[in-house]
Curated annotation (Swiss-Prot):
Organism (species): Desulfotalea psychrophila (strain LSv54 / DSM 12343)
Cofactor binding description: Binds 1 zinc ion per subunit.
Lineage: superkingdom: Bacteria
A biological process term (GO) from this entry: translation
Subunit (UniProt): Part of the 50S ribosomal subunit.
Residues annotated to bind Zn(2+): C16, C18, C36, C39
GO molecular function: metal ion binding; rRNA binding; structural constituent of ribosome
Alphabetized PROSITE patterns for the sequence: RIBOSOMAL_L31
Protein name: Large ribosomal subunit protein bL31
Function of the molecule: Binds the 23S rRNA.
Cofactor section: Zn(2+)
HAMAP family listed in its UniProt record: Ribosomal_bL31_1
Amino acid sequence: MRKDIHPEYHKINAVCACGNEVELGSVETEMKVEICSACHPFFTGKQKLIDTAGRIEKFKQRYAKHFEKKAEA
């Protein structure tokens, strides 16, 4: 393997916007991220279901006849 052609790999602390720090290996000297597993809604279980403009109600109205036919059968 040739010398001096590969970047130097070292341990760094990646810092999230929430303040969480994770130790990683990288060729970068520092890393800042906006979201991590400590603050992401998928991992924290604090997901919110947002019904914008009544999409669920519109769907139910549009397919109400279809669902009624299946219920009768």
